[in-house]
């Protein structure tokens, strides 16, 4: 049993690729971040809360009290043979108010930080176990942005449609190179979240970003 536990906690190793197609060593993915059981219910709860928090909640309809006009009784109370009416802005009239319509509200849900972190670990672990976590030295060689070069490089890493690229905030060359590519989403390490990881088919880290993420969540650092 002890041997099984040690095996389960063994760090994963992935190759580090360079823009010219070569392999520049490997990096270890700490088991505590990239090899934990995926709690589907937890990830669903966290993603639901994240998506709810993104809603503006500014929708608003007018009730009969908000609609202008309708202050005069449309016709007398009795003697017409028709149902009594007090205002043409009542909900049953065209141009009247809305019954039980949406009003501005806050959709955000309170989610503990530990739950958010655990869900992210589960999502990353799922991608890592299926060989969908990748590490690169940089997206393009040099300091000149090149969308064509970045596209070609990513195509050698994965042929799937949705790719999450995690790079440092200061890597403007990388950002400018991939920001217009369809199906490619860019995040910095501190922006990494469960929804974007699950939405992506593959996650591509720069070594710098991977190092920053691991350092912020463990006491280890990656060296390529």
Swiss-Prot record:
Signal peptide: none annotated. One of its GO terms (biological process) is translation. InterPro entries: Ribosomal_uL4, Ribosomal_uL4-like, Ribosomal_uL4_dom_sf. GO terms for molecular function: rRNA binding; structural constituent of ribosome. One of its GO terms (cellular component) is ribosome. The keyword Ribosomal protein applies. Residues 52-109 are annotated as: Disordered. Gene3D superfamilies: 3.40.1370.10. The keyword Cell membrane does not apply. It comes from the Bacteria. Keywords: Ribonucleoprotein, Ribosomal protein, RNA-binding, rRNA-binding. Belongs to the universal ribosomal protein uL4 family. Part of the 50S ribosomal subunit. One of the primary rRNA binding proteins, this protein initially binds near the 5'-end of the 23S rRNA. It is important during the early stages of 50S assembly. It makes multiple contacts with different domains of the 23S rRNA in the assembled 50S subunit and ribosome. Forms part of the polypeptide exit tunnel. This is Large ribosomal subunit protein uL4. It comes from Mycobacterium marinum (strain ATCC BAA-535 / M).
